[in-house]
């Protein structure tokens, strides 16, 4: 196995490095968790999980997440784009300190939300002019509600705009059940919850003419959100049929020529996840489970410290004792973060990404652009350069 550390630098990865990262996942049979983030706090919790588990991570923002990030009081047509860009800048500013590859992605964009997508693309273009790479690594278009032909046409139109900046496109075809971001598929005909190999191939055919950097979320009985077990029949074995069909059509030497993405994975069994990954899933979305984890950390903290959280002064240790340490947001938000970090780590374990990006164990060394650089040596040679010869 080629070491990921030798081919992909730490920090936000875009373009060729992103392609290398996802090819590495495909070729080595693991997937990367993509976690919906709605704040700097939740983003940091993901970065912490990635750093502690030597794993790459995908941080993604939804339209609703973007609108929340800008501030709920702001009612502006560009609010969601502005908030999404703000999260991207936050992640860009801090990612390098965590020492692992980070993918910046935007989640489901239905037809009515295209102005949000356009706003983020504008930010990508601006960033590209300044730094020669886009702000985001990747964006998702979800036109699965539209007829297939229109879905694919719109994806082609956008992918042509994105390809020159080497931005990844994730698209969805077929119906994922449940409800997310205002799209409600709760009462859909169960037969329609499975994308066919022909549908997947038609996407491959259209997008591969433009570039290799795209992935497909094909429905295989997945449902957004958490449902009672038994209500959904997940069929990850169908994903292999997609791979085989396209492989045959294009005569590919790759066993799994298509990058697949798993949505609606909350509540899936470990075996279902494993089978999906072995059939070419390289990214799995996580939202519902990490939302719960974030809340659960706070819930447990409040239950344990309840009597210290009822007023600014006065607790079981005395009527005049201050409680500032307990109600400082850095205390209780941190509890939420720790709980979410642990949940993201669990997903990394299930998806097999743990340990794929080992940081150097040599003291004082860190990775810069994939090369191990000894910080002490670097400082010594810099100091030597300053001394008179
Ligand atoms: Zn989806």
Model-derived features with residue positions:
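Catalytic-face loop-and-helix region of soluble metabolic enzyme cores
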Residues: 95-96, 228, 238, 242, ...
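Alpha/beta enzyme core
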Residues: 16-24, 40-78, 82-99, 110-256, ...
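N-terminal amphipathic alpha-helix/helix-capping segment at the start of soluble metabolic enzymes
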Residues: 1-33, 252
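Flexible, glycine/charged-enriched surface loops at secondary-structure junctions
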Residues: 32, 165-172, 210-215, 251-257, ...
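Extended, intrinsically disordered, low-complexity segments
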Residues: 303-389
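Glycine- and other small-residue-rich loops at beta-strand/loop junctions that grip anionic moieties
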Residues: 10, 35-38, 106, 144, ...
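Short, conserved beta-strand segments within well-ordered enzyme catalytic domains
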Residues: 34-36, 58-60, 103-105
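Generic enzyme active-site microenvironment
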Residues: 105, 170-172, 261
């Amino acid at each position: 196995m080629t070491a990921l550390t030798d081919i992909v630098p730490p920090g936000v990865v875009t373009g060729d490095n992103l392609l290398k990262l996802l090819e590495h996942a495909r070729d080595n049979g693991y997937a990367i968790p993509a976690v919906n983030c709605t704040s700097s706090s939740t983003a940091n919790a993901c970065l912490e999980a990635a750093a502690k588990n030597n794993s790459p991570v995908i941080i993604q923002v939804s339209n609703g997440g973007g609108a929340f990030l800008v501030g709920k009081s702001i009612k502006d047509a560009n609010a969601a784009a502005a908030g999404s860009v703000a999260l991207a800048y936050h992640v860009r500013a801090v990612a390098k300190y965590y020492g692992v590859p980070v993918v910046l992605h935007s989640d489901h964009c239905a037809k009515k939300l295209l102005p949000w997508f356009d706003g983020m693309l504008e930010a990508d273009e601006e960033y590209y002019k300044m730094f020669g790479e886009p702000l985001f690594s990747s964006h998702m278009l979800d036109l699965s509600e539209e007829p297939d032909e229109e879905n694919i046409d719109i994806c082609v139109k956008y992918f042509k705009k994105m390809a020159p900046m080497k931005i990844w496109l994730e698209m969805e075809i077929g119906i994922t059940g449940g409800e997310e971001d205002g799209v409600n598929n709760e009462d859909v005909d169960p037969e329609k919850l499975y994308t066919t190999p022909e549908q997947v191939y038609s996407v491959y055919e259209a997008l591969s003419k433009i570039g290799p950097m795209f992935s497909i979320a094909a429905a295989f009985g997945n449902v957004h959100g958490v449902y009672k077990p038994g209500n959904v029949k997940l069929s990850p074995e169908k994903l292999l049929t997609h791979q085989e069909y396209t492989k045959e059509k294009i005569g590919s030497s790759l066993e799994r020529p298509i990058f697949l993405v798993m949505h609606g994975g909350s509540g899936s069994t470990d075996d279902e996840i494993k089978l999906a990954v072995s059939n070419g899933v390289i990214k799995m979305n996580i939202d519902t489970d990490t939302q719960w984890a974030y809340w659960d950390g706070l819930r447990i903290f409040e239950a344990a410290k309840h009597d210290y959280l009822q007023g600014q002064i006065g607790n079981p240790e005395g009527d005049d004792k201050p409680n500032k340490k307990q109600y400082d947001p850095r205390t209780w938000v941190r509890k939420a973060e720790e709980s979410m970090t642990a949940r993201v780590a669990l997903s990394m374990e299930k998806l097999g990404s743990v340990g794929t990006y080992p940081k150097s164990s040599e003291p004082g060394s860190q990775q810069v652009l994939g090369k191990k650089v000894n910080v002490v040596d670097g400082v010594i040679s810099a100091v030597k350069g300053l001394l008179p010869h």
